[in-house]
Structures are given as C-alpha cells and as structure tokens.
Amino acid sequence: MVMTAEDKAQVIGEHKKHDGDTGSPEVQVALLTSRIVYLTGHFKSHPKDFHSRTGLLKLVGQRRKLLNYLKKTDVQRYRDLIAKLGLRK
C-alpha cells in the first residue's frame, strides 16, 4: 500500500467528526482522494500501467458513490467536503 500508517492517521485526523471516527463518508472520501492523487502522479511516469488504471477507475467510482450518498443525506457536509478537498461538483 502506498500510504503509511502515519499518512493515513493524518488524513483521518483532518476529517474525523469525533475520536475513533474512521468510517464516516468524509473520512472515506478523503482517504480515497489521497490514493487517487498518488495514482494520478504514478501514471505520469508509468503511462502504460493499465492494470493500475483499472484500480484507479474503481476508486473514482467508489468515491463518487460516497459523495452522492453524502449529497443526498446532508448537502452542507457535502459542500464543505468538496471545498476542503478541492474537488469539482
């Protein structure tokens, strides 16, 4: 895995709602976003890595599903999260 335990703990700490929060949509989207950013950089130096590209598309789809769920349940939390992560709507 690309992210070390310290990196993961830092991302969780920035987006958690309470102590021990690892499963909220905000935390999950933030973790997926960090993996997506890493893989995007990976493809700049490895353009023919199609197997990893398939994994990237799965991650993007999973993040999209979580964002859609968050948008349906609480629009304000959705807007705050995409602003914080710098994502498009």
Swiss-Prot record:
Quaternary structure annotation from Swiss-Prot or TrEMBL: Part of the 30S ribosomal subunit. Forms a bridge to the 50S subunit in the 70S ribosome, contacting the 23S rRNA.
Function: One of the primary rRNA binding proteins, it binds directly to 16S rRNA where it helps nucleate assembly of the platform of the 30S subunit by binding and bridging several RNA helices of the 16S rRNA.
Stretches assigned to coiled coil: none
UniProt family annotation: Belongs to the universal ribosomal protein uS15 family.
Keyword Cell membrane included in the entry's annotation: no
Protein name (Swiss-Prot/TrEMBL): Small ribosomal subunit protein uS15
GO molecular function, one term: rRNA binding
Bias (Basic and acidic residues) ranges: 1-21
Entry GO terms, CC: cytosolic small ribosomal subunit
Species for this entry: Solidesulfovibrio magneticus (strain ATCC 700980 / DSM 13731 / RS-1) (Desulfovibrio magneticus)
Region annotation Disordered: where it falls in the sequence: 1-24
GO biological process: translation
Keywords (A to Z) from UniProt: Ribonucleoprotein, Ribosomal protein, RNA-binding, rRNA-binding
